[in-house]
């Protein structure tokens, strides 16, 4: 999602960003707030959103922000919107939200104003939530500003609070045998910051799920698993496809459009069990 820029912001900007993160963090809700979140089959959930920012190759300024909404549980795209943007803030680890969230927020607000009936009931975000240097990643930031339930879905482990991608961590990953198996990410502080989830039988690389806003970790993990036709949950995957295709068309680049996922590859029914270490969730 992020592309590192050559220069960093001045120290006063970083201090301002830290204060803003601390202010917004006070509004994070890390529990279920909707009835559908507590239902084993997510009854009542009809629309799941995904967001992504893709970059023009070799360009740290030009990018494409994308929002898609999928029907649930069918996982068919019912809304998509992409726009080319010019990024003004540099990439700094731990401050991704200040670079990307303003554009994603605009897309959500546009949908809310123009087609409120298609508003997602939850957003899956390519990035971290409370699994973050200061406990306030991009999924928290977007969740608080939109007041939507948000889930952080990261492809790599953010090594904070003593979490390390060491031999012990790799052994825990090896023990994730089937789709839905997971284990908690317990920091040195004693806090469970997220879960490592095997999201697909054909991928041994886990996803790192964390709370963004207005959703419990248990529900976030179950929902992510229910949204996976492949390793990456479909809302995030389709947002990535949409943004890359928009870049291709906007720049007149050659190549056929990226195919949508086939309907035949739908996830199995949502789980009814509880999450826990190495427990099958779907």
Curated annotation (Swiss-Prot):
Q: Which CDD domains match?
A: Endonuclease_V (cd06559)
Q: List the disulfide bonds.
A: none
What molecular function terms (GO) are annotated for this protein? DNA binding; endodeoxyribonuclease activity, producing 5'-phosphomonoesters; magnesium ion binding; RNA endonuclease activity, producing 5'-phosphomonoesters; single-stranded RNA binding
* Protein family according to the UniProt entry: Belongs to the endonuclease V family.
- Keyword Cell membrane carried by entry: no
Gene Ontology cellular component terms for the protein in this record? cytoplasm; cytoplasmic stress granule; nucleolus
The gene name on file is ENDOV
Residues bound to Mg(2+): 52, 126
For this protein, the record's InterPro entries field holds: Endonuclease-V
Question: Pfam families of this UniProt entry?
Answer: Endonuclease_5 (PF04493)
Q: What is this protein called?
A: Endonuclease V
Gene3D superfamilies, sorted: archaeoglobus fulgidus dsm 4304 superfamily
Q: What binding partners and quaternary form does the record give? A: Monomer. Interacts with PABPC1; the interaction is RNA-dependent and stimulates ENDOV activity.
The record's listing under HAMAP family reads: Endonuclease_5 (MF_00801)
Q: Provide the cofactor list for this protein.
A: Mg(2+)
Q: Keywords, A to Z? A: Cytoplasm, DNA-binding, Endonuclease, Hydrolase, Magnesium, Metal-binding, Nuclease, Nucleus, RNA-binding
> What EC number is given for this enzyme?
3.1.26.-
Result after altering residue 91 to A: Abolishes ribonuclease activity without affecting ability to bind branched DNA
């Amino acid at each position: 999602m992020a592309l590192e820029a050559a220069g960093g912001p001045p120290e006063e900007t970083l201090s301002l960003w830290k204060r803003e993160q601390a202010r917004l963090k006070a509004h994070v809700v890390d529990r279920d707030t909707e009835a559908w979140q507590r239902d084993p089959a997510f009854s009542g959930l009809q629309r799941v959103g995904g967001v992504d920012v893709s970059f023009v190759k070799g360009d740290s300024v030009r990018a494409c922000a994308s929002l898609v909404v999928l029907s649930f549980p069918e996982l068919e795209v019912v809304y998509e919107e992409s726009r080319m943007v010019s990024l003004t803030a540099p990439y700094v680890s731990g401050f991704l939200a200040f670079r990307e969230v303003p554009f994603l927020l605009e897309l959500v607000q546009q949908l809310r104003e123009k087609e409120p009936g298609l508003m997602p009931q939850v957003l899956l975000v390519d990035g971290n939530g409370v699994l973050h240097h200061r406990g306030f990643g991009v999924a928290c930031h977007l969740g608080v500003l939109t007041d939507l339930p948000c889930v952080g879905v990261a492809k790599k482990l953010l090594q904070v609070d003593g979490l390390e991608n060491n031999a012990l961590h790799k052994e825990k990953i090896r023990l994730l045998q089937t789709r839905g198996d997971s284990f908690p990410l317990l920091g040195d502080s004693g806090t469970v910051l997220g879960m490592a989830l095997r999201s697909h039988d054909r991928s041994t690389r886990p996803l790192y799920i964390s709370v963004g806003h207005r959703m419990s970790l248990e529900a976030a993990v179950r929902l992510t698993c229910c949204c996976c036709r492949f390793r990456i949950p479909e809302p995030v995957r389709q947002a990535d496809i949409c943004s890359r295709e928009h870049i291709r068309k906007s720049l007149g680049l050659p190549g056929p459009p990226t195919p949508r996922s086939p309907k035949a590859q739908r996830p199995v029914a949502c789980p009814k069990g509880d999450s826990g270490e190495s427990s099958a969730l779907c």
